[in-house]
């Protein structure tokens, strides 16, 4: 991997005598944690989630608790992405990550995990194939990856916890969901029959449907984590299993 010259990141890696960062963990791991790209500490140590990031991860795993031996830890991009001034940046999805992706794909073929956990916004956007994904809004939600034939969940990256430590509670909550998922052994989720009320006529149909129910549930999606102050994106209703 250190001989890789597939993209422009190889030049900065060789110039600084840094390393490409391989994945690490158990090749029988049911859980794969993956970030978009490594940082300097990971490149020097040739180990993903090294340094302070690893300390945050260990604290989260201890709080759950979840055994580290159940994890394979990796990066979509194997080299440290730097800007023109030599400062760390996120990997470019359309170039650097795509050229590096065969390494990750091969590893997933070998491991065949039950769930891939995307650490941070960039990794979640790429693995889900949805640029509109937002880690603050979509963290902890379970999706299905047709490409990797396993489930996918996004969680906060440890760098977010280092900047805003109170967010560690959300990371712990999400990892508890992952543990629960493994214990229950859920299968691919059934498609939900959604009706989207984008105009007045459809809205009236939905309201008419709701008025006939003895009970229903609802969920409010907002632009952030504080539903009391953030703007409302949509209000979802369900009046039966796999309907909304």
Roles of regions detected by a PLM:
Residues 1-186:
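A polyanion-binding, active-site-adjacent surface
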Residues 41-42, 46-48, 52, 57, ...:
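Conserved RNase H-like, two-metal-ion catalytic cores of nucleic-acid enzymes
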């Amino acid at each position: 991997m250190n001989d890789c010259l597939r993209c422009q990141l190889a030049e900065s890696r060789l110039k600084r005598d840094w390393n490409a960062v391989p994945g690490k963990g158990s090749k029988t791991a049911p859980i794969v944690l993956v970030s978009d790209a490594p940082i300097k500490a990971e490149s020097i140590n040739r180990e993903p989630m090294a340094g302070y990031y690893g300390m945050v991860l260990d604290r989260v795993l201890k709080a759950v608790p979840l055994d580290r031996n159940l994890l394979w830890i990796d990066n979509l991009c194997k080299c440290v992405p730097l800007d023109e001034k030599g400062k760390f940046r996120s990997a470019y999805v359309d170039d650097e990550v795509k050229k590096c992706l065969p390494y990750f794909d091969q590893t997933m073929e070998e491991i065949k995990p039950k769930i891939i956990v995307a650490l941070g916004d960039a990794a979640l956007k790429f693995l889900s194939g949805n640029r509109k994904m937002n880690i603050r809004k979509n963290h902890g939600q379970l999706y299905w990856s047709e490409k990797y034939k396993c489930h996918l969940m996004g969680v906060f990256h440890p760098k977010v916890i280092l900047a805003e430590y109170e967010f560690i509670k959300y990371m712990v909550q999400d990892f508890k969901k992952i543990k629960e998922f493994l214990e229950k052994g859920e299968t691919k989720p059934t498609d939900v029959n959604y009706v989207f009320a984008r105009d007045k006529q459809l809205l009236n149909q939905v309201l008419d449907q709701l008025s006939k129910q003895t009970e229903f549930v609802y969920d409010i999606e907002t632009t952030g984590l504080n539903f009391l102050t953030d703007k409302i994106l949509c209000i979802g209703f369900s009046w039966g299993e796999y309907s909304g």
